[in-house]
């Protein structure tokens, strides 16, 4: 069962159609690593994360940000089954990577911030409410494998 109204789905999909995954993905993951520096420990193989400029200019950060937002695009296509959509990723992040599930919530909130910056007046309070609901649903789905 979905908690998303028709209005939520319309707000999410119409904004998503405008999102440049490459730009928004790198910006979102980069900001996560700058604002919440303890998250950097999951990205040891990314090279220098020694300063905000190093993080924001890091091609591996940008590439992984694209991967994250591409995955989010799949969620947007499957809003009625977020848990099913993220089953394998939840297992990977829980069992192999041991990512604190709180980080999923933080990433979602950073994404909402990035969307607000990129889309300004289009990112109305109603659109934000729909996106907050969606990123909370994604965070919950990603945390579903945790005990």
Swiss-Prot record:
One of its GO terms (molecular function) is haptoglobin binding. Pfam families: Globin (PF00042). The keyword Signal does not apply. The keyword Metal-binding applies. Keywords: Heme, Iron, Metal-binding, Oxygen transport, Transport. InterPro entries: Globin (IPR000971), Globin-like_sf (IPR009050), Globin/Proto (IPR012292), Hemoglobin_b (IPR002337), Hemoglobin_oxygen_transport (IPR050056). Heme b binds at residues 64, 93. Residues 3-147 form the Globin domain. GO terms for biological process: hydrogen peroxide catabolic process. GO terms for cellular component: blood microparticle; haptoglobin-hemoglobin complex; hemoglobin complex. Red blood cells. Heterotetramer of two alpha chains and two gamma chains in fetal hemoglobin (Hb F). Belongs to the globin family. This is Hemoglobin subunit gamma. It comes from Callithrix jacchus. The lineage of its organism: Eukaryota, Metazoa, Chordata, Craniata, Vertebrata. The gene is HBG1.
């Amino acid at each position: 069962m979905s908690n998303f109204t028709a209005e939520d789905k319309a707000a999410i999909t119409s904004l998503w159609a405008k999102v440049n995954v490459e730009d928004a993905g790198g910006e979102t993951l980069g900001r996560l690593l700058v604002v919440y520096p303890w998250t950097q420990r999951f990205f040891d193989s990314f090279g220098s994360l020694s300063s905000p400029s190093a993080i924001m200019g890091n091609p591996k950060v940008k590439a992984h940000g694209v991967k994250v937002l591409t995955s989010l695009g799949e969620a947007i296509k499957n809003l009625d089954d977020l848990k099913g959509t993220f089953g394998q990723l939840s297992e990977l992040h829980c069992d192999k990577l041991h990512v604190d599930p709180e980080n999923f919530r933080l990433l979602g909130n950073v994404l909402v911030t990035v969307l607000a910056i990129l889309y300004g007046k289009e990112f109305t309070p109603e659109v934000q409410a729909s996106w907050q609901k969606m990123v909370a649903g994604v965070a919950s789905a990603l945390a579903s494998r945790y005990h």
